[in-house]
């Protein structure tokens, strides 16, 4: 059985309470809190609100979706981020692997990011937290090969990766490459130009994806992200179809 949830960045314009109500309406127990709008680090009022809402709606924080990027080397900020994740009960902190595509990262930059990641991981480990990289274009974590190369170089048990589709022919190979380092899957259906569709539109592809994940026995969290028209109704439809696809 998969642990299915969604991320608050799905509805950046909605309040924290509205998001928790949507989770409740869809029988969702797991949530990823984004740090850009709904839970900034060092915002005690937002934190207190999140803790109250999680208790009221019976929600468990899966991860803290931050926008910390390797290269910042801002360890005081990182301490605040880990404190926030720890406070809400999240075991995963999502960060970004630099600001350059893997093809543009030189050896010195690569090694510097490895060193920074080790420091971040050690701080996170003291609080029982896992660091997981967003799988995204425009970062070093933009394909399976570069992702695994970096994770092996870091060589920390509490450093993993997300995976998400790029709507290209490389999606399946990328997934297979990172499968044993997988913490979470961001789920959405769109084309290479960013046009959004219902999850059902990509059923055949997602069936293959879940077959690979099933066989790996890695059991990552499945986190719905973007939906067509930013629609609450579309999220409900996509979650229903996701449960069909995963037999959940």
Where are these regions (language model features)?
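Active-site groove signature of glycoside hydrolases
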Residues: 90-105, 127-137
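Conserved active-site loop/cleft motifs that coordinate metal ions or position small ligands
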Residues: 184, 220-227
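Acidic/histidine-rich catalytic cores of soluble enzymes
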Residues: 30, 61-64, 121-206
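Acidic-and-aromatic substrate-binding clefts and catalytic sites of carbohydrate-active enzymes
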Residues: 9-16, 34-46, 67-76, 101-105, ...
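A short helix->loop->beta-strand "cap" motif at the edges of active sites that frequently abuts
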Residues: 59, 90-91, 129, 215-221
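P-loop/Walker A phosphate-binding loop and immediately adjacent motor/lid segment at beta-alpha junctions
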Residues: 197-222
């Amino acid at each position: 059985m998969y642990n299915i949830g969604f991320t608050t960045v799905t509805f950046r314009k909605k309040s924290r309470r509205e998001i928790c109500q949507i989770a409740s309406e869809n029988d969702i127990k797991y949530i990823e809190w984004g740090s850009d709008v709904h839970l900034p680090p060092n915002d005690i009022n937002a934190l207190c609100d999140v803790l109250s809402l999680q208790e009221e709606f019976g929600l468990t924080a899966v991860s803290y979706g931050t926008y910390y990027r390797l290269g910042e080397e801002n360890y005081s900020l990182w301490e605040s981020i880990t404190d926030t994740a720890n406070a809400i009960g999240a075991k995963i902190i999502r960060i970004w692997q630099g600001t350059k595509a893997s093809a543009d990262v030189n050896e010195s930059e690569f090694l510097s990011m490895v060193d920074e990641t080790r420091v971040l991981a050690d701080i996170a480990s003291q609080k029982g937290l896992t660091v997981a990289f967003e799988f995204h274009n425009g970062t070093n974590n933009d394909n399976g090969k570069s992702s695994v190369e970096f994770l092996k170089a870091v060589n920390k048990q509490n450093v993993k990766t997300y995976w998400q589709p790029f709507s290209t022919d490389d999606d399946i190979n990328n997934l297979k490459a990172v499968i044993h380092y997988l913490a979470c899957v961001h789920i959405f259906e769109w084309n290479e130009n960013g046009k959004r569709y219902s999850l059902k539109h990509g059923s055949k592809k997602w069936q293959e994806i879940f077959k690979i994940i099933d066989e790996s026995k890695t059991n990552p969290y499945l986190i719905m992200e973007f939906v067509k028209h930013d629609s609450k109704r579309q999220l409900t439809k996509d979650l229903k179809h996701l449960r069909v696809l995963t037999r959940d």
